[in-house]
């Protein structure tokens, strides 16, 4: 034993001696050994035990090093690598924080100047008021500001306008020319994209943003000047004239057309001067403002479809940062001529929050997105480049905007659709689906059926999220299959379809998203199976390319969209797209604004009359603010390819389908409204039915009256809302059905919805007989007379069927009549209620 220990010490001593340099200091590895280890580390930073042993055998200069030592070397090497990366990251973060701190200090200085200015103005106004009160002989004198007349047709005049635009823009971006207030819901912080503000008490609507972007100033300016690439509402932008300004800058005359967000108002266009220059401090500026005069552009007929809007001094101030990157200030200041839209839409055109979300915030987010992509921070699946996916999103959005606006110069013309006065139907015979490889094309085009609706008390983000996640609640699979089949044929001809059953399953496959997840691009696969016996094993799946935006409920003024188009399962980059979808825009209603959409110049459909989600007339005065302040405009547009000889048939199908979608949206809106069907808030369950709280009381009271026992254990001090909550959370499945010849369910508690595997929206399509098997239906029929005579009936244990086809067993079912507690009539039968006790899936 002693000999073994001595041998081990001798080997250790020899090993250490081999790693002493000429000065006697301990050196763990020689330069040759380190070089060999570095080569292996470059190939595999974390080699396994077998790989390390193999390394010792293959590399003779490492033969005298123990495997454990090599393991420790690789561990230390990985730690040093991690430390270097972390140090580099911290330096980058420190630079960003320093730049952000500088930005915040400047913002603080600007706010202090603004406060001082307001204090001075307040003191001056008090002094003037005192003078007027004390000196009644004082006459007010109105002075009109005098502007020097400049010739906008000469370079000298344009340069004068450009310099004035620059001064006005800088005073808005970094000064106090506009009274800025923080954008609601966009509190600045470490995780924020930037600092956002909107105007208060100024001419028009304005928004401002400033933030840090890891791109060079020239690159940022180039991106932002290409407005159609990031501003989804920009239809076209054309530079008519460009000439040097003489000071190193450039002056451009620009004509821009924008889309209208709904079918209810005309689109806007702008005729502007854009001035690009650099400042003495190294900053880069792009500023822009409207010019007087028509400046209609190359096509006067096209310009006649637009209302000329005004752009007040706006633009971008881009300052380089130490260590790379830039600080950017963005100002958008517009006058959208709200007088030209229906009263119900005016708040949309007078909202700085909407301009902030659509333009200012979108611009900064887009720049940040490109910066992250260029730095390799964004990785997308399916091998798609970010630029390709971004192009798909832009094409979907542009195609939907084209359909909603239906510009004549794009080939759109309006046709009449019999029996659908609330739906606009337009056709476009200039659109072609066939690609270059398919030389055969049929005469036809694309038909669009569209409508706009006013909804109340429906959060746009919640509505769009529901439509995305529950497509089967509103969509017809056969219509999707029709569009997909037409797309595969590569022409307008309808190739024919075999009978297909939709399985009810949709699979959403994400492709990419923006940095803050405000927009998602995805492929949706709708699973279908042929009903024909010879094709029983063939897949009839339908694939849709889809973008979903604005599902953040906290984004004030944000537009929510769900836009989709059928696409080939091979998903080629140049795939033709015929988009359809939904757009929901919040409208900040003003008190006293009661003008509804029927006064609009365009045909529309007002769902509010049938939703009945507002307060009752006797309570309207107490809730006037809530009933008028939460409104949104829903725009629906669906496009269908057609062949000329089938135009009328496709138009009829399109009208019928859009009407069906509208009806489904109506039910969805009723269900998801915060003042709709909810355990905590009373509401109308359906047109003509009582409020949820009242119905819960009727169900409980009628049960006690007929069976002599309590359905719910209610505290003597419990409120009316607690009755609804107890009913909603009851362990037994409780359902109510109407007294029509074919009873249809109108309400169910949570257990009832779970048992039927359905939602409150789809519940109203389920009849009573659908949920029972044959024996259950016989039991209902045999006890129905008893139920109607004595007011209740107890059904034996049995089996019922969920909407998904699953069997559900229950120990007992109790049915009873529900009476409406009315002062005039105590025997007012309202509906039938059922309670399924101890139910479970078989």
UniProtKB/Swiss-Prot annotation:
The keyword Ribonucleoprotein does not apply. It comes from Arabidopsis thaliana. This is Homeobox-leucine zipper protein REVOLUTA. CDD domains: bZIP, homeodomain, START_ArGLABRA2_like. Keywords: Coiled coil, Differentiation, DNA-binding, Homeobox, Nucleus, Transcription, Transcription regulation. GO terms for cellular component: nucleus. Residues 90-121 form a coiled coil. The gene is REV. Transmembrane segments: none annotated.
């Amino acid at each position: 034993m002693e000999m073994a220990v001595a041998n081990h010490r001798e080997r250790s001593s020899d090993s250490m001696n081999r790693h002493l340099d000429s000065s006697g200091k301990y050196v763990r590895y020689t330069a040759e050994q380190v070089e060999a280890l570095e080569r292996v580390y470059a190939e595999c930073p974390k080699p396994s035990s077998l790989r390390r042993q193999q390394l010792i055998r293959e590399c003779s200069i490492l033969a005298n090093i123990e495997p454990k030592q090599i393991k420790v070397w690789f561990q230390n090497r990985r730690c040093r690598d991690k430390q270097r990366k972390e140090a580099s990251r911290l330096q980058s973060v420190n630079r960003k924080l320093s730049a952000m701190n500088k930005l915040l200090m400047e913002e603080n200085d600007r706010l202090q100047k603004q406060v001082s200015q307001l204090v001075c103005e307040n003191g001056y106004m008090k002094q003037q008021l005192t003078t007027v009160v004390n000196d009644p002989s004082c006459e007010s004198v109105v002075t009109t500001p005098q502007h020097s007349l400049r010739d906008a047709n000469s370079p000298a005049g344009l340069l004068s306008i450009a310099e004035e635009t620059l001064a006005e823009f800088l005073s808005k971006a970094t000064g106090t020319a506009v009274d800025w207030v923080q954008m609601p819901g966009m509190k600045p912080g470490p995780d924020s994209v930037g600092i956002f503000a909107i105007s208060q008490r100024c001419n028009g609507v304005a928004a401002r943003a400033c933030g840090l972007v890891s791109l060079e100033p020239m690159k940022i300016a180039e991106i932002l000047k290409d407005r159609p690439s990031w501003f989804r509402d920009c239809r076209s932008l054309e530079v008519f004239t460009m000439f040097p300004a003489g000071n190193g800058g450039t002056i451009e005359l620009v004509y821009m057309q924008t889309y209208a967000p709904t079918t209810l108002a005309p689109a806007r266009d702008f005729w502007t001067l854009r001035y690009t220059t650099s400042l003495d401090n190294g900053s880069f500026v792009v500023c822009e403002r409207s010019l007087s005069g028509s400046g209609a552009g190359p096509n006067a007929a096209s310009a006649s479809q637009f209302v000329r809007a005004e752009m007040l001094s706006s633009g971008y101030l881009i300052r380089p940062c130490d260590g790379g990157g830039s600080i950017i200030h963005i100002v958008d200041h517009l006058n959208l001529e709200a007088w030209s839209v229906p009263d119900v839409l005016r708040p949309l055109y007078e909202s700085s929050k909407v301009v902030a979300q659509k333009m200012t915030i979108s611009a900064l987010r887009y720049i940040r997105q490109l910066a992250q992509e260029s730095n390799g921070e964004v990785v997308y699946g399916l091998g798609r480049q970010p630029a390709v996916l971004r192009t798909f999103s832009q094409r979907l959005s542009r195609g939907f905007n084209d359909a909603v606006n239906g510009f004549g110069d794009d080939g759109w013309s309006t046709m009449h659709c019999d029996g659908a006065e609330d739906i606009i139907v337009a056709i476009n015979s200039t659109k072609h689906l066939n690609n270059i490889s398919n030389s055969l094309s049929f005469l036809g085009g694309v038909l669009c059926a569209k409508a706009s609706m006013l909804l109340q008390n429906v959060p746009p983000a919640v509505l769009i999220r529901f439509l995305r996640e529950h497509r089967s609640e509103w969509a017809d699979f056969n219509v999707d299959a029709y569009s997909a089949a037409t797309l595969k044929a590569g022409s307008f001809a309808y190739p024919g379809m075999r009978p297909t059953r939709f399985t009810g399953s949709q699979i959403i496959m994400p492709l990419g998203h923006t940095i803050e997840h405000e927009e998602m691009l995805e492929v949706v696969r709708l699973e279908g199976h042929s009903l024909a016996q010879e094709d029983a094993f063939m897949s009839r799946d339908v694939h849709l390319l889809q973008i979903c935006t604005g599902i953040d409920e906290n984004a004030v003024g944000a537009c929510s969209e769900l836009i989709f188009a059928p696409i080939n399962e091979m998903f080629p980059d140049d795939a033709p797209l015929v988009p359809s979808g939904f757009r929901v825009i919040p409208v900040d209603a003003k008190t006293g604004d009661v003008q509804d959409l029927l006064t609009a110049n365009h045909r529309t459909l007002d769902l509010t009359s049938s939703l009945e989600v507002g307060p009752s007339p006797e309570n309207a005065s107490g809730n006037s603010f809530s009933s008028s302040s939460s409104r949104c405009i829903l725009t629906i547009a669906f496009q269908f390819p057609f062949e000329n000889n089938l135009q009328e048939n496709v138009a009829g199908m399109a009208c019928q389908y859009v009407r069906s979608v509208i009806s489904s949206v109506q039910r969805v809106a009723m269900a998801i409204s915060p003042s709709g069907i909810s355990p905590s808030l009373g509401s109308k369950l359906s047109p003509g039915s009582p409020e949820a709280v009242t119905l819960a009381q009727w169900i409980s009271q009628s049960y006690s009256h007929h069976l002599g026992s309590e359905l719910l254990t209610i505290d003597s001090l419990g409120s009316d809302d607690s009755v609804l909550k107890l009913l909603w959370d009851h362990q037994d499945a409780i359902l109510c059905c109407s007294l029509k010849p074919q009873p249809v369910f109108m309400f169910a508690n949570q257990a009832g919805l779970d048992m039927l595997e359905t939602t409150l929206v789809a519940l109203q399509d389920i009849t009573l007989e659908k949920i029972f098997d044959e024996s259950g239906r016989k039991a209902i029929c045999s006890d129905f007379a008893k139920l109607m005579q004595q007011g209740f009936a107890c059904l034996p244990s049995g089996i019922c069927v969920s909407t998904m086809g699953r069997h559900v067993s229950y120990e007992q079912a109790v049915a009873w009549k529900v009476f409406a507690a009315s002062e005039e009539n105590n025997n007012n039968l309202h509906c039938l209620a059922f309670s399924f006790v101890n139910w479970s899936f078989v």
